[in-house]
From Swiss-Prot:
This is Zinc-finger homeodomain protein 3. It comes from the Eukaryota. GO terms for cellular component: nucleus. The gene is ZHD3. Signal peptide: none annotated. The homeodomain differs form the typical one by having namely 4 instead of 3 extra amino acids inserted in the loop between helix 1 and helix 2. Keywords: DNA-binding, Homeobox, Metal-binding, Nucleus, Transcription, Transcription regulation, Zinc, Zinc-finger. It comes from Oryza sativa subsp. japonica (Rice). Putative transcription factor.
């Protein structure tokens, strides 16, 4: 029995597994002729083991990647020490100096400024950077085929370069950019945040003033149906009416209860005009504000007390005169 096509799982080489350039490997097999022993079990195509030459090339690729990592240099420190107070201040460190041996935790901290290495600007050496595109015969991953197979096309995903270091922007720059954006967009957020002011007509003001005087400048004691009906008639909302009454309570109410002297003089001069119709609600408010009159019994009691005091003083005067005459005799 021919078992040449049934091959087990191949072991994964350590050097190939550790390589950062190990990507997806797709093999497109073009078979000519009938299905021979080249097809694996269950329709799978098994790849031959990696030859020594390919392993050497993989090791060489790993060395190049390590040298590219070592080529990165960290320049000036960008840590903002005044971010808590909204300012921008750096320590002036010009280049990262490791504080310990390579591989230790102290190696990630700068011995000059004491900041972490990530705060320093990262600079990559363009000459030592690994190329982004390789041919299929330069990088061979797990299960790759040796050179000379014209029927296999290898597509490798090369590991991308490390992401660029995030620049720490000062708060002043960020605020400036935001203000520039706001200035570049007229009618944007500033107009949206502007409070809308309600404008009333003269008729609405007169009707709201009369309603406020009738209810005593308060809406708590009224039924909601009455207030809602009035708001629908005037064309304002309940909240708007309440705010208007609160804003004009100390001005319009006092003006109507205590008119100015000029207005009173004008009313006196206009004798021919008929007197205005008295408002019962206004009369009640005026009566409540006036002090209560003193009772008549209090006046009578005070007059009686004064008369009794005068009579007692006259009696004492007579007694004093009699005593004086007796002493002289």
């Amino acid at each position: 029995m021919d078992l040449s096509g049934a091959q087990g799982e191949l072991p994964l080489p350590m050097h190939a597994a550790a390589s950062p350039y190990l990507g997806l490997h797709h093999d497109h097999h073009h078979h000519h002729g009938g299905g021979g022993g080249g097809g694996g079990m269950n329709g799978r195509h098994m790849s031959p083991p990696t030859p020594p030459a390919a392993a050497e090339e993989s090791k060489a690729v790993v060395v190049v990647s390590s040298s590219a990592t070592a080529a990165a240099r960290y320049r000036e420190c960008l840590k903002n020490h005044a971010a808590a107070i909204g300012g921008s201040a750096t320590d002036g460190c010009g280049e990262f100096m490791p504080g310990g041996e390579e591989g230790s935790l102290d190696a990630l901290r700068c011995s000059a400024c004491g900041c972490h290495r990530n705060f320093h600007r990262k600079e990559l050496d363009a000459a030592a950077a690994p190329p982004l595109h390789h041919h299929h015969h330069q990088l061979l991953g797990v299960g790759a085929h040796p050179r000379g197979h014209g029927h296999h096309h290898h597509h490798l995903l090369v590991a991308a370069l490390p992401p660029p270091t995030r620049m720490v922007m000062p708060l002043s720059a960020m605020h400036t950019s935001e203000s520039d954006d706001a200035a570049a967009r007229p009618g944007g957020g500033a107009a949206a945040r502007k409070r809308f002011r309600t404008k009333f007509t003269a008729e609405q003001k007169a009707r709201m003033l009369g309603f406020a005087e009738e209810v005593g400048w308060r809406l708590q004691k009224l039924e909601d149906a009455v207030v809602q009906r009035f708001c629908q008639e005037v064309g304002v909302k309940r909240r708007v009416l309440k705010v208007w009454m609160h804003n004009n309570k100390h001005t319009l109410a006092r003006r109507h209860l205590h008119p100015s002297p000029a207005a009173a003089a004008g009313d006196d001069d206009d004798d021919g005009a008929p007197p205005p119709h008295p408002d019962p609600r206004r009369r009640e408010l005026a009566a409540a504000a006036a002090p209560p009159p003193a009772p008549v019994t209090q006046h009578i009691k005070k007059s009686v007390d004064n008369k009794s005091l005068i009579s007692s003083l006259a009696a004492l005067h007579c007694i004093a005169l009699l005593l004086f005459h007796q002493i002289d005799a």
